[in-house]
UniProtKB/Swiss-Prot annotation:
Its main location: cytoplasm. Residues 105-182 are annotated as: Disordered. RNA chaperone with significant RNA binding, RNA strand exchange and RNA duplexing activities. May regulate ProP activity through an RNA-based, post-transcriptional mechanism. The lineage of its organism: Bacteria, Pseudomonadati, Pseudomonadota, Gammaproteobacteria, Enterobacterales. It holds the Pfam family ProQ_C. Residues 137-146 have a biased composition (Basic residues). This is RNA chaperone ProQ. SUPFAM superfamilies: FinO-like. It comes from Escherichia coli (strain K12). NCBIfam families: PRK04950.1. Keywords: Chaperone, Cytoplasm, RNA-binding.
Amino acid sequence: MENQPKLNSSKEVIAFLAERFPHCFSAEGEARPLKIGIFQDLVDRVAGEMNLSKTQLRSALRLYTSSWRYLYGVKPGATRVDLDGNPCGELDEQHVEHARKQLEEAKARVQAQRAEQQAKKREAAATAGEKEDAPRRERKPRPTTPRRKEGAERKPRAQKPVEKAPKTVKAPREEQHTPVSDISALTVGQALKVKAGQNAMDATVLEITKDGVRVQLNSGMSLIVRAEHLVF
């Protein structure tokens, strides 16, 4: 047991649990609601494995159940599961409402952070603009060279070195993407890209709805996107 590798972060613990209990935990895509009291089940089942402590398990569970993809899975009609994927009863309305509020608060925090970052960028740009508009120093007049006397020998001009023509830099080839023609062929957890102007952002399918496809970006933000904005 002493030779087992040690998991150093909650994300590594979650990845281990997803591999150890694939019918309960997932490393990507929408997560299933967990059985109440599953912490003690984990302690009993994985005690001593990978040198895991109770503190590590508790921290990993807290991170897992507060993630956006887990909160999306806590919805009316969803069923809790145990470590082996067996159903353990439907979610009650109180837990569904609590998850909805947590998700709204998390989104609000992300929006506030982005607004703060944008404000700092605008402030920095304004400061740089003020420096450019500052009055320039007056240049001193260049000294006049004395005129050559009549009859004096003219010095030969130094020849300028021949400048080499700059090498043309080839423009980078644009990455080719395949548009999504049929959203019904997509699956939850599938990786694809969302077009935003000339760029394409990586995303994961969370849910397929009548209005489009709900995806989650790498930043954690989720949104519903129509098929014409999805590519592989």
